[in-house]
């Protein structure tokens, strides 16, 4: 980002700031010519960013016939799109507005509030204010997207979006999302915490999927299936990935880790929960056998000199990125599965529900989960 100017308004008085960049630690310092009075203040920042090509921040797809843009902010790339407190433990409500070509569909975390009239081929889409979210969970996608049928679970509408021409391939994903959401609401004992649930298929994506609140992004090869041509393994992978991302709506989004050293708690829980959900929906798939196979892969990774603790000390953005691996996901899920078997399924579920209720719309650490399980 290029920060052009900044000012703070306190009690109706505006104070201009000097901007001091610290690229080595990816922070910025705003200096004022006098001490600001205690109390609420409004910080206004003028900035300019760029659309990237490396699947980070706000980036463009490679398909020049159907141009599109999307965001990928996890773990530490929100700061490449807009100035923010880019830490998981700091949450805010966001008012997102996007100006784009009038013919394009614009998607974000919240439902559309209004769209302006097209002027010179562009229009602005304004979204409703989000609930409290960490910056890395904000999502925007712009392009020639279309959706098919809508599923409804409780008050939550579910849609699958893909580039034009791929709409029939989202049928299985829509069914899997609805079946997962039904079971997750029952397990957590509370409804889905966001106003909608969009599943968005992107041809170019850094991960298999990303659990942005209310607008989950997927690599299209993971989300979209030709049911006549796909294998049982393909369907299992799609269902498991969807269940994993939807589990994050509660464990990760509604309650977020306070810092990246507890990333394992988010990812291992979603991994474990996805297997529980898919097994309950399709027991004939015997998905726990797949879990055993993945655990062996985690064992092999854990035996290397480069292994790390499940909960390592994270001090930099690079260290946060390095922990998205099988140790965090699968070894952590194995630990949680052992814990669930030790305390009992009912006690474990009760403890997690307590943890979610205590810390909803906030951040928590592993110790908070252990306290809820006592």
Where are these regions (language model features)?
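Hydrophobic alpha-helical and helix-loop surface patches within well-folded domains
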Residues: 3, 13, 24, 127, ...
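Acidic/His-enriched low-complexity segments
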Residues: 1-199, 221, 226, 324-326, ...
């Amino acid at each position: 980002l290029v920060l052009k100017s900044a000012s703070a308004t306190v009690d109706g008085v505006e104070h201009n700031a000097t901007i001091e960049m610290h690229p080595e630690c990816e922070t910025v310092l705003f200096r004022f010519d006098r001490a600001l009075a205690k109390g609420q203040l409004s910080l206004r920042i003028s900035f300019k960013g760029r659309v990237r090509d490396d699947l980070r921040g706000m980036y463009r797809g490679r398909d020049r016939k159907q141009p599109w843009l999307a965001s990928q902010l996890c773990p530490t790339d929100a700061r490449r799109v807009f100035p923010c407190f880019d830490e998981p433990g700091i949450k805010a409500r966001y008012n997102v507005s996007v100006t784009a070509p009038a013919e394009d569909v614009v998607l974000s975390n919240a439902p559309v509030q209004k769209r302006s009239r097209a002027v010179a081929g562009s229009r602005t889409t304004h979204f409703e204010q989000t609930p409290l979210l960490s910056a890395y969970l904000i999502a925007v996608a712009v392009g020639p997207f279309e959706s098919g049928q809508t599923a409804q679970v409780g008050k939550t509408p579910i849609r699958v979006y893909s580039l034009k021409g791929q709409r029939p391939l989202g049928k299985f994903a829509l069914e899997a999302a609805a079946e997962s959401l039904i079971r997750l609401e029952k397990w957590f004992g509370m409804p889905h915490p966001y106003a909608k649930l969009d599943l968005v298929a992107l041809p170019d994506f850094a991960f298999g999927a990303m659990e942005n609140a209310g607008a989950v992004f997927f690599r299209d090869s993971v989300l979209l299936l030709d049911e006549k041509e796909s294998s049982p393994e393909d369907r299992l992978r799609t269902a498991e990935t969807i269940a994993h991302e939807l589990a994050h709506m509660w464990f990760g989004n509604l309650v977020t880790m306070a810092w990246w050293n507890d990333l394992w708690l988010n990812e291992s829980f979603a991994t474990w929960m996805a297997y529980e959900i898919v097994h309950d929906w399709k027991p004939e798939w015997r998905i726990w056998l797949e879990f055993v196979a993945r655990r062996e892969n985690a064992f092999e990774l854990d035996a290397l000199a480069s292994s790390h603790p499940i909960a390592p000390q994270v001090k930099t953005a690079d260290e946060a990125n390095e922990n998205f691996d099988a140790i965090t996901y699968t070894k952590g899920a194995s630990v949680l599965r052992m814990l669930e078997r030790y305390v009992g399924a009912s006690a474990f579920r009760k403890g997690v529900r307590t943890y979610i209720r205590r810390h909803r719309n906030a951040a928590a650490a592993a110790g908070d989960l252990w306290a809820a399980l006592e």
